[in-house]
């Protein structure tokens, strides 16, 4: 039994080193992290665009999509009819019109030398929305997760 505690502690420490890959940086709200990861008003080459995201997480994110629109326009999608998200929650909303976007996929490298392919797209998107936190823009709901691309 005495041997179990150190082993459990080691597992928790190791899990903590893996878990932050999907965690939101502590000083950011979910909406701000969504904006950093997914909003780019104009197209940008993926190697450069992903560098900023990967610097927050200290790893190469395998895939990411940038919506080429304003945060305000994307947040307006949160006011549309709610639909079911991939995780079964009912806080997702689908865009009415397609938007230009860039899909970035990791092709090689390890942090900080991550290399990505860049693919331009014009598609609909589904986002998860939640009430804003204190430092978020004063909308009824704000985007917090890019659930899917259609």
Swiss-Prot record:
The lineage of its organism: Eukaryota, Metazoa, Chordata, Craniata, Vertebrata. The gene is RNASE6. It holds the Pfam family RnaseA. The keyword Cytoplasm does not apply. Glycans are attached at residues 55, 100. GO terms for biological process: antibacterial humoral response; antimicrobial humoral immune response mediated by antimicrobial peptide; defense response to Gram-negative bacterium; defense response to Gram-positive bacterium; innate immune response. Keywords: Antibiotic, Antimicrobial, Disulfide bond, Endonuclease, Glycoprotein, Hydrolase, Lysosome, Nuclease, Secreted, Signal. The record marks 59 as: Facilitates cleavage of polynucleotide substrates. One of its GO terms (cellular component) is lysosome. This is Ribonuclease K6. It is found in: Secreted; Lysosome; Cytoplasmic granule.
């Amino acid at each position: 039994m005495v041997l179990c505690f150190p082993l459990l502690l080691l597992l928790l420490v190791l899990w903590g080193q893996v878990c932050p890959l999907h965690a939101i940086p502590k000083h950011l709200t979910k909406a701000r992290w969504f904006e950093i990861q997914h909003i780019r008003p104009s197209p940008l080459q993926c190697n450069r665009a992903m560098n900023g995201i990967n610097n927050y997480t200290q790893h190469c994110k395998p895939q990411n999509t940038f919506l080429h629109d304003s945060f305000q326009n994307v947040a307006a999608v949160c006011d549309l009819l709610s639909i079911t998200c991939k995780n079964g929650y009912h806080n997702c909303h689908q865009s009415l019109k397609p938007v230009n976007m860039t899909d970035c996929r990791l092709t090689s490298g390890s942090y900080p030398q991550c290399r990505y392919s860049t693919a331009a797209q014009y598609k609909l998107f589904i986002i998860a929305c939640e009430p804003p936190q204190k430092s978020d823009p004063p909308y009824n709901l704000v985007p917090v997760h890019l659930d899917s691309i259609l």
